[in-house]
């Protein structure tokens, strides 16, 4: 059994109502509940945290090094394009992570095309709406099974 951590960046608390044509109609609570259920069905635990504050996400990443977290799933949202501190935190704890995006940032505004995390991620899944999270979790579960 592995302990997994799912982090959501800024404005994802507005899922379901914020630009549903871009981000879909699923709420964050619905996404989290489905993922927790899937992780449990595979014999793992999944903790979820959303924050609009970068330092809260950084501190949670730091804590992951000590709490037995095996893998981090992260949708950094707008911090994707701006946060050296998230990058440094993820590299500092040395845990594998998957970068997740509901939309495909490469089909959007040019400022969204650069990620400070992608080159260090175990994988990047984007463009599939709420299914991006499910696909990321399935990839992590498969990796854990392969490596065990």
UniProtKB/Swiss-Prot annotation:
PROSITE patterns: DEHYDROQUINASE_II (PS01029). The active site is at 23 (proton acceptor), 101 (proton donor). GO terms for biological process: amino acid biosynthetic process; aromatic amino acid family biosynthetic process; chorismate biosynthetic process; quinate catabolic process. The record marks 18 as: Transition state stabilizer. It catalyses: 3-dehydroquinate = 3-dehydroshikimate + H2O. Transmembrane segments: none annotated. GO terms for molecular function: 3-dehydroquinate dehydratase activity. Keywords: Amino-acid biosynthesis, Aromatic amino acid biosynthesis, Lyase. Pathway: Metabolic intermediate biosynthesis; chorismate biosynthesis; chorismate from D-erythrose 4-phosphate and phosphoenolpyruvate: step 3/7. Gene3D superfamilies: Dehydroquinase, class II. Pfam families: DHquinase_II. Its EC number is 4.2.1.10. It is an enzyme of class 4 (lyase). Substrate binds at residues 75, 81, 88, 102-103, 112. SUPFAM superfamilies: Type II 3-dehydroquinate dehydratase. Disulfide bonds: none annotated. Homododecamer. Belongs to the type-II 3-dehydroquinase family. Catalyzes a trans-dehydration via an enolate intermediate. HAMAP family: AroQ (MF_00169). This is 3-dehydroquinate dehydratase. It comes from Xanthomonas campestris pv. campestris (strain B100). The gene is aroQ.
